[in-house]
């Protein structure tokens, strides 16, 4: 597998990047990877720690930001992170290419019928009118091999475009997607919230295709922890998952405060966030941050049928007791 061939170097790099973090602290510490957007429970923990009885009192979190899920998979496999945001495909690739053993302990967001679906945009005056027109073009994606790559690649192949040969695929973080498109650095680029809302309000871009066209009800991001870390520190991870559960409840119960929290993390204006966040046109969220293992299994099966993964059973990612919601 092409992605797997990069694991030794990538995982070693991840370990070096985080090796300087000291583990000698009075309270037990979890090293957690995060990204943007759509991790409201973790944003609450980061920006409103006083709202969580255990956080900073019985345990600490060392937060490290990444551009996407694939680099966090590498860091987990290298032992440089204990828990991190993951997508089903990136986590599965970690198992295949990095011998990663992990538990899915919570879920952040999924695509729901009628809600937001990650999409690829082009400029209004672009000659690109359909997916087949992407041949020979430069296309931006947040992270190659990350959560959006699977359905993106499948959709292109279905329309006669080989994502490895027919396009120039470049990594463009969600936060700079709009600028990359408007400045002509890419011909098409992925859009996620709140950056999609900002681009749509400004005008001059149009949707080419969305991931829901290939894979409805995608589980986009979940929370995973290294199995060895969980098995060695079950009470510590339980406390963390309790706070993930509580963070999701707080995010959904107090939208006004959540708008402020997300604005602080994403540096996005509240009026932009207010157009979609926690509304019908947003992603879906389970109120208890519970993972939808059935939906994740369906995604793994689809990736297997597409030749992207070996056959994989989601049961390997289930811990018998440490999984959201935890009270």
Residue spans for each PLM region:
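Soluble non-cytosolic domains of exported or imported proteins
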Residues: 66-70, 85, 142, 146-147, ...
């Amino acid at each position: 597998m092409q992605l797997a061939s990069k694991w030794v170097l990538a995982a070693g790099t991840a370990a070096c990047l985080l090796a300087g973090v000291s583990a000698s602290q009075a309270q037990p510490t979890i090293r957690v990877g995060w990204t943007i957007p759509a991790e409201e429970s973790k944003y609450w923990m980061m920006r409103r720690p006083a709202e969580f009885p255990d956080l900073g009192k019985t345990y600490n979190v060392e937060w490290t930001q990444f551009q996407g899920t694939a680099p966090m998979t590498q860091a987990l496999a290298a032992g440089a992170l204990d828990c991190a945001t993951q997508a089903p495909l990136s986590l599965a690739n970690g198992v295949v290419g990095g011998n990663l053993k992990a538990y899915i302990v919570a879920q952040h967001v999924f695509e729901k019928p009628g809600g937001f679906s990650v999409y690829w945009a082009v400029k209004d005056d672009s000659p690109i009118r359909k997916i087949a027109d992407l041949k020979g073009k430069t296309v931006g994606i947040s992270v190659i091999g990350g959560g959006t790559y699977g359905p993106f690649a499948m959709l292109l192949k279905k329309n006669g475009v080989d994502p490895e040969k027919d396009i120039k695929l470049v990594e463009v973080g969600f936060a700079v997607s709009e600028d990359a498109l408007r400045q002509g650095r890419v011909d098409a680029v992925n859009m996620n919230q709140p950056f999609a809302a900002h681009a749509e309000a400004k005008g001059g871009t149009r949707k080419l295709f969305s991931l829901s066209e290939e894979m409805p009800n995608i589980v986009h991001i979940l929370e995973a922890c290294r199995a060895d870390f969980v098995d060695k520190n079950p009470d510590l991870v339980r406390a963390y998952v309790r706070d993930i559960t509580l963070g999701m409840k707080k995010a959904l119960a107090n939208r006004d405060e959540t708008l402020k929290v997300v604005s602080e993390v994403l540096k996005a204006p509240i009026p932009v966030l207010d157009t979609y966040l926690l509304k019908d046109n947003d992603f879906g969220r389970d109120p208890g941050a519970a993972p939808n293992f059935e939906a994740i299994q369906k995604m793994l099966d689809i990736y297997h049928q597409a030749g992207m993964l070996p056959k994989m059973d989601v049961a390997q990612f289930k811990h018998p007791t440490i999984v959201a919601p935890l009270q």
